[in-house]
From Swiss-Prot:
Record organism: Citrobacter koseri (strain ATCC BAA-895 / CDC 4225-83 / SGSC4696)
GO cellular component terms listed in the entry, alphabetical order: plasma membrane
Designated name of the protein: Protein TsgA homolog
SUPFAM superfamilies: MFS general substrate transporter (SSF103473)
UniProt keywords, alphabetically: Cell inner membrane, Cell membrane, Membrane, Transmembrane, Transmembrane helix
Taxonomy of the source species: Bacteria, Pseudomonadati, Pseudomonadota, Gammaproteobacteria, Enterobacterales
Amino acid sequence: MTNSNRIKLTWISFLSYALTGALVIVTGMVMGNIAEYFNLPVSSMSNTFTFLNAGILISIFLNAWLMEIIPLKTQLRFGFVLMVLAVAGLMLSHSLALFSAAMFVLGLVSGITMSIGTFLITQMYEGRQRGSRLLFTDSFFSMAGMIFPMVAAYLLARSIEWYWVYACIGLVYVAIFILTFGCEFPALGKHAPKTETPVVKEKWGIGVLFLSIAALCYILGQLGFISWVPEYAKGLGMSLNDAGTLVSDFWMSYMFGMWAFSFILRFFDLQRILTVLAGLAAVLMYLFIKAQPEHMAWFILTLGFFSSAIYTSIITLGSQQTKVPSPKLVNFVLTCGTIGTMLTFVVTGPIVAHSGPQAALLTANGLYAVVFVMCFILGFVTRHRQHNVPAAH
């Protein structure tokens, strides 16, 4: 593979994460305006965004098999057509049913693109370099999560219709579409070059089960935590502005943490540092919940920094449980994480209704403790050390 081809594929991976991050995180910014547009209460409007998450979940799950049937380049180009149709649907229609359908299509497109992006990184890079590259790729999710809410705020403050926010997000896919030209993608399944030696199907091993549980609990814990921090902080007498600042502090330090760990991880055994980070994150979250309001910002900043490498390290370790990275395995771990996203309000909503926001935060803390236990047990069964060959590039 030529160096320019590798750079193009790497940028497609970066942008695939930015696309999903923009779509998922911008929701909170535009929900009120969309509810007004359809003359609906915000609470019932939030349910229609489940179509976005459902689209992401279904496409990540199905793409484990589709990757071997439909070439990656074809998928990305077809995704561009779907993206244009979905954004056009948002702009031209005043129907809630069509809005929900367009959200579902946007979810499908971003899920397919993100699973391809993850697979490309696991395919092109090996050993410790794979972990640091995946981490840097994942930082684009957070970066888009910082940039696009600002874009949305700028447009909405000037009374520009909410659907132009989605048109701006569509520009990310335009860049992906342009990058597919003159770019060779790895061939999979029936399109892969035939080799003399038959491919031996590797068993995944029990380590994948531990990592999948860790992925689900981590995402459910993280989103359950960050979704209820503003309500919890307001309950302690903080202003809405200060409560919102806690959330943006978390994502900012999360992004800086990703950049730092994309360098640091190269020098450590991935399973060991993951166990340390998971334990540290559980302790820091507990300290945040028990802290006085004046100390909360410091705890959430350190929590964001030290927890930033956990999810990507889980995916990387998953990809290293087999000698040859398997798209089905990587997508399985990703799917478990996405299920965590889907369950966020299903799990935390009733807890908050019954016992208040602090109970939701303590539940999230318990989930982080489960992640630590899974990572610790993984140390006894992981196969990544026998497959971990130093990368040549």
